[in-house]
Design a protein with these regions (language model features):
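A residue-level marker of the well-folded mature domains of exported/periplasmic proteins
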Residues: 8-10, 28-335
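N-terminal export signals
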Residues: 7-27
């Protein structure tokens, strides 16, 4: 069964599909389901694109869904945002966590209040109902390292950025990438512990400058976090290192297109944050109807969905290449 944007992500577990995830809601007299989605930080292109998907799916579903964007990538701000949504008595709270552990107590309070909790980019999250991912952790980490190692010629010194040292998924991507490097490209050398700066363009910029000074022979920067490539690219161009240092990572295409076209960012991979926003709303809407995802379903434009009920995890694998051949198409899509 193929699920379009107007069809269900999942049927009822072990039974017939009683509703559809993505189908327009029938207008009823009762209050529309309320869905609040808290992202890592507001005002950056990645989450702006996610908000477009949230709004689109909300209209499609006939629900009230909105995005809450903290002013900083700060765990305490996310906790306060979730507390506010609990006080509003919403039906579902969605979160892209900055710090999975810091959110556990407030997620417990949400569930105690009868509110469903859905996360993204936090596959081992506690006290949520479901987490969904549009790539597998190993697939994402390995894809980046394979490209990175090829461009570095399989040798040389490199550093790694993640969005934060407390974002589990970013660190899992880095773990898989580094493991892949050690197994396949032993002549590459990680010269520092990973840096938790890639949700801030300014921090990524400053860290790149610092590491270029500390390691004049640095040959590569691999970054997981959408602002990492942008900040590092600024630093490389400022220091005249854009040709000698390989820069690879995921970012919002509209923000990084200039650096791809001039060769400073050599490539990377992303999933579509607009689709992630849509899935947030569709999954949440189905949960308000008592429906549960089932293994083997497909999402249009994403592909097959693997559902692991024991881990409360929904997995797909759909990556877009951030290279000169594909970047304009992604920018045209509004990413």
């Amino acid at each position: 069964m193929i699920l379009t944007r107007r069809q269900s992500l999942a049927g009822l577990a072990g039974g017939a599909l009683l509703g559809t995830l993505g189908a327009p809601a029938i207008v009823r007299a009762q209050k529309k389901p309320q869905i609040g989605i808290v992202v890592k930080i507001g005002g950056i292109p990645w989450f702006n694109a996610m908000e477009v998907g949230i709004k689109k799916a909300a209209e499609e579903q006939g629900v009230d869904a909105w995005m809450v964007g903290p002013t900083q990538a700060d765990a305490a701000q996310q906790v306060r945002a979730v507390e506010d949504l609990i006080a509003r008595k919403v039906d579902v709270i969605g979160v892209v966590p900055n710090d999975a552990t810091a959110l556990e107590p407030v997620f417990q309070r949400a569930q105690a209040a009868g509110i469903k909790v859905v996360t993204h980019e936090s596959p081992d999250q506690k006290y949520n109902d479901w987490d969904f991912e549009l790539t597998t952790a190993q697939g994402y980490g390995d894809a980046h390292m394979e490209l990175f190692a090829k461009l570095m010629g399989g040798e040389g010194k490199y550093i790694v950025y993640v969005g934060s040292l407390t974002v589990p998924l970013h660190n899992l991507w880095a773990d898989f990438a580094i493991k892949e490097q050690k197994e396949k490209w032993p002549n590459m050398q990680l010269v520092a512990d990973r840096f938790g700066v890639a949700e801030s363009m300014d921090d990524s910029y400053r860290t790149a400058l610092d590491q270029l000074r500390a390691h004049p022979d640095l040959k590569g920067i691999l970054t997981f976090g959408s602002q990492g490539p942008i900040g590092a690219a600024r630093a490389l161009e400022e220091r005249g290192k854009e040709k000698s240092v390989v820069l690879v990572g995921g970012f919002s295409p509209g923000q990084g297109v200039k650096y791809v076209k001039d060769g400073t960012i050599r490539g990377g991979f992303i999933w579509n944050p607009m689709v992630a926003g849509e899935v947030f709303v569709r999954l949440s809407t189905n949960l308000t109807k008592g429906q549960t995802p089932t293994d083997g379903m497909e999402i249009a434009d994403v592909g097959p969905v693997h559902v692991d009920p024991a881990k409360r995890l929904i997995l797909a694998q759909k990556l877009e290449s951030l290279d000169k051949e594909n970047i304009d198409r992604l920018v045209t899509m509004g990413l």
